[in-house]
Amino acid sequence: MTRNVTLLTFVLLTASPILAQVLSSTDAATKLRALFDEDWQWVLQQYPEAATMLGDNRFNDRLTDYSTEAIERRKAHERDMLDRIQKINRSELKGQDVISYDLFLQDKKLNVDGLRFPTEYMPIDQMNGVQIGFGQLVGSTPFRSAKDYDAYIARLSAFPAQIDQLIA
């Protein structure tokens, strides 16, 4: 009996730190993946045309909001994501999660640093802008049901407002 208690005590004492480290690592990895998912869903929602081109049809009835308020929300989101990724303890991550962490952190640093250059004042150039993207969007838009057509009509109807936002 004493031998069993001694063995159990030894197992618990050695397993506790290992288990705590595994749980901590899993917690950091879980937080990291949740942050990635939250950011990705935000991007798809903020840029519905991109979502459509990627095959995500949840936002096919919308266009990107270029209002001053929306632009400020996107800037705040980038700052928030940078702050939140830095709160995840990188040393608790392993393997691919470390690489993903580093890439995401670098991306968010570049995005926040780039906010110094207000690209919203030049939304159209010879390579990019609604004058090009809107016409190309139809090639990625599904037209399999009446709902698909209704979504596209809603998008067409929103186009003048989007142009007004870009002019403002």
Predicted regions and their residues:
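Non-catalytic accessory/assembly modules
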Residues: 22-168
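Generic anion/oxyanion-binding catalytic loop in active/binding sites
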Residues: 9, 21
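N-terminal signal peptide c-region/cleavage motif recognized by signal peptidases
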Residues: 15-17
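Bacterial N-terminal signal peptides that target proteins for export
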Residues: 1-8
